[in-house]
Amino acid sequence: MMCGLAALCLALSGATAAAAQEKCVGDGPHLKVIVEGLRNADGYVSVELYPDDPKLFLAHNQQLAVAHDKLTGMEQVVCLSVPKTGYYALSVYHDENGDDQFNRNKFGIPTEGVGLSNNPKIMFGLPAFEKVRFKVAEAETTIRIGLRYFLGKSAN
């Protein structure tokens, strides 16, 4: 768990609000991400889009698009423009305290909610890349991501 969580933590710690759109408008394909399982409506939700390359997934500064949106409720919709149709992967985290960082305890365990595209189990390491990749079609593709909290209360 620590190795996979460490990679996820490292990748999410550098999220910035770049290349994101608040609404699914404009030309080209769009990705509508519905973030579920928030344990509260505090802070922000960060969504990162990665290319179809296992070596680049969660790698520092390899995101194709990043959104860092203020939460408006217990479910958040985030829209991203994607470069073209094809396969991608997503990571999401709940920046609960709004400090623009993915917080962890002294053992490296996330103290904020995390999720990946296709909602694979995150147990003792990151899932295989094939489990997180998904296809963006023409126009708009919708994907739902449920957050998981390793510490403290979860939404459920």
Which sequence ranges carry the predicted segments?
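Bacterial N-terminal signal peptides
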Residues: 2-14
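Extracellular beta-sheet/turn segments enriched in Thr/Pro/Gly and aliphatic residues
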Residues: 21-23, 31-32, 113-150
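A short, amphipathic beta-strand motif
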Residues: 29-37, 47
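Beta-strand signatures of extracellular beta-sandwich domains
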Residues: 46-50, 91
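Short proline/glycine- and polar residue-rich coil/turn motifs
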Residues: 68-74, 135-137
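Exposed aromatic-hydrophobic patches
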Residues: 76-82
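A short tyrosine-centered beta-strand micro-motif
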Residues: 86-92
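Acidic, glycine-anchored loop motifs typical of Ca2+
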Residues: 96-104
